[in-house]
Amino acid sequence: LSILASTISSYAGEEIEDLIDIAESKSKIIAIIEGRKTISFELRPKEKVLWSGSKGYLGAFLTDQRFFVISTSSTAWQVLPLRINEPEKGVASLSPYIALLVTGDRAIGFDAASNRFIETQLPIHDELLAAEAEKYVAVVITSSRAFGLAKETSAFSEIHLRVRESIEAIKITSSKATVRTSDRLLTFEVTGSTWNEHRLY
């Protein structure tokens, strides 16, 4: 099976300025918000940073023990503990409004508006095909399901693939995800925050 996965950044309007600068120094993670407010967090002994990023209203760190996210309206780093072996399998992505972390059995989003983590379980033994946060939406595609998270929503939206239905193409833009399967066209948009399906045959 050949999967075509293309991620297209088609931001509407002006691009959002990065409002958070992040750094790691002397076993601390540091966020400087809008050049004025500095918020730091002490890492544990031997805790190692695996990934970091900042974009728009968010900054994030993934360590071998925890997932840290901060927004421009935060007064402290938000911290999510991770289970053993989760960080090594983690796929992280960041947009101006949404932070996304996908591990072996769960997808974790963080919305800048609500300042909280949003979690959903992934099917065991599924293959991960795509995990991407774009401007207003974050999408996780596995071999049996598609999950979408929109800006300012409180839960992932989920749609199941049918028996013998296969994914042929995935396209993710700033406000919409389109998944073409062997039977259907599945779309997830920030305006509706749910998956819509259109039969191809």
Cite the ranges covered by each PLM segment:
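Bacterial N-terminal signal peptides
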Residues: 1-6
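An edge-strand/N-cap motif at the start of beta-rich repeat modules
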Residues: 8-40
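Repeated scaffold domains used in trafficking and secretory/extracellular systems
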Residues: 11-20, 44-57, 82-97, 123-136, ...
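Structural motif
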Residues: 27-30, 65-71, 105-111, 144-150, ...
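N-terminal, post-signal-peptide region of Sec/Tat-exported proteins
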Residues: 31-67
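A short beta-strand motif characteristic of beta-propeller blades
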Residues: 36-43, 47, 76-82, 116-122, ...
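Blade-level signature of beta-propeller repeat domains, shared across WD40, Kelch, NHL, RCC1
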Residues: 180-201
